[in-house]
Amino acid sequence: MDDQNKNLILATALSFLVILVWFLLFPPEEPVTDPNAPTQITQSGETADVALTPPAAVTEAAPGAAPQTAATPTENAPRVQIDTPALEGSISLLGGRIDDLSLRNYNETLEPDSPIVRLLSPVDAPGAYYALYGWAPAGTLSFDDVPGANTLWTVESGDTLTVDTPVVLRWENGNGLIFRRTLAVDDDFMFTVTQSVENTTETDKRMQPYGIIARHGEPDTINFFVLHEGVVAMADGSLIESDYDDMLDYDFVEREGARAEVEQIEQNGWIGFTDKNWMTTLIPTPGQPFTSVAKYVGNADIYQTETRLPTQTVPGGQTVTVETRLFAGAKEWEAIRGYERELGIEGFIDSIDWGWFYFLTKPIFFVLHELNLLIGNMGVAIIVLTLLIKALLLPLAWKSYVSMARMKELQPEMEKLKEKAGDDRQKLQVAMMELYKKEKVNPAAGCLPILLQIPIFFSLYKVIFVTIELRHAPFFGPFQDLSAPDPTSIMNLFGLLPFASPEPGSILALIFIGILPLLLGISMWLQQKLNPAPTDPTQAMIFAWLPWVFMFMLGTFASGLIVYWIANNVITFAQQYFIMRRHGYKPDLFGNIVASFKKKKPSEDK
């Protein structure tokens, strides 16, 4: 391998190292609220302790009408239980809020007594997070004539919401309007919300149906720039994402009474909040135009998303019904893809944060997912995926390793050219290029597989980091969560000594690495030894340290990523060794290892 080739490899490795350091040392800063920002006011003029309901649908709403915003305790409100294979919780009859929801199949940690993940919480609980439906008044109606956040509903039918038994809620306004809300749920995470209004009067009534998802206070987020957390929406084919700190910078919209972004959707769309693994989304019927709203209510510190359907006219003596959906659950690829296909929810699969390299992350995840279903072990699936990637890149790798072998054959001639050129670098470069051209050798060909590995590495990193299928995915022995760092540590001899490993994220955990990062460093070091050390002393020193620097830098990354990197190094080693031997160059692995431990004499460095 000549100096140009080594310089390119070194530059690539160092650039990769800089990116890793940036990942570790420079996460985004916590958002800071501007103390000089204008105070937001609710439509009622009071502090809003519950979601800010939409304004009147049209300007001719009854004078003095105001949405319900005053807080009402929910802990004593009657409830209807939710009981499905995937979900458990309850619906508060106060406002008909879906505000108590937990995910049966997901625990917070791997501990045996770990509680299941709670997704939604009522207003009087820490981190309140809930879905709310209602009607905004239009025409001659006031907010007292329509159900809102604090309306007390009664159960018309259904004692428990299950997959087979929907629940019907009922409320009469006392002025001839009867409102019903039918809630149904499937085996996974999709609710169907059907709102109807029966007009028993003789005059037409007008009102606008809406749905709201509200979060009180900024939730605990990972706050890492490779992951989106916050508003996620689809607007007629365009994906819209806003972090929580972005919402603080929305323009103040007078009609909304808050900082808000309002989008008019013509045919297909949805909006909600996404976390790393969980999501809540309001989904109008595909083909239905609606208004999509994301807002931040500053004086109450409430983040919310809304969908507002077109204003409905309910003729006297008739009933009008509208249907929407609510997704509330885990971002499982199979479930989300199924909803996109079966329900026609455009772009729903893009609610998973595939990142800039989506053209790589999507197929990589698909193959990894299918392999895991086939094999039944995510760690083994990652190794098989690595084999498939290396097989796909084999034609390029073959050419590059053949080129490297040819470079070895030309080494004696290159040394002669160096002697002839002396200190004339320009003359040497010209002579080298003529030699390469004559022998049909590309000196940079050896770097191509390395360059291709960078986007693949970051795509796999993205897949492991953001997809829920890797969460708590076991490999073997102590490796029970491939989305988490290696739990073993050299400090207690990988579990042989009777004391715990360092706390993850601590300085000790960075120093006393686990067995997987150690194997990574060794595999990189052995791969280097297929070639003699560079003649340039500076290059030789950097190359000597590079495997061990990567070992410590990658030690805090997800263990699934380290498994991939180790497998990649081992396969690359085998490929390179076999191809180079086949083309006449026999790597002196043992000799290069021995030479790396010998101390050079000063004369050898000159």
Swiss-Prot record:
List the GO molecular function terms. Answer: membrane insertase activity
Q: GO annotations under biological process?
A: protein insertion into membrane; protein transport
| Membrane-spanning intervals of the chain | 8-28, 378-398, 448-468, 506-526, 542-562
> According to its record, how does it sit in the membrane?
Multi-pass membrane protein
Composition bias of kind Low complexity appears in: 59-78
Q: Which UniProt keywords apply?
A: Cell inner membrane, Cell membrane, Chaperone, Membrane, Protein transport, Transmembrane, Transmembrane helix, Transport
The principal localisation class reads membrane
Q: Where are the annotated coiled coils located?
A: none
- Where is the segment annotated Disordered? 59-79
Give compartment(s): Cell inner membrane
- Per its UniProt record, what Pfam families does this chain match? 60KD_IMP (PF02096), YidC_periplas (PF14849)
- What binding partners and quaternary form does the record give? Interacts with the Sec translocase complex via SecD. Specifically interacts with transmembrane segments of nascent integral membrane proteins during membrane integration.
What does it do? Required for the insertion and/or proper folding and/or complex formation of integral membrane proteins into the membrane. Involved in integration of membrane proteins that insert both dependently and independently of the Sec translocase complex, as well as at least some lipoproteins. Aids folding of multispanning membrane proteins.
> PANTHER family, per this entry?
CYTOCHROME C OXIDASE ASSEMBLY PROTEIN COX18, MITOCHONDRIAL, OXA1
Protein name, please? Membrane protein insertase YidC
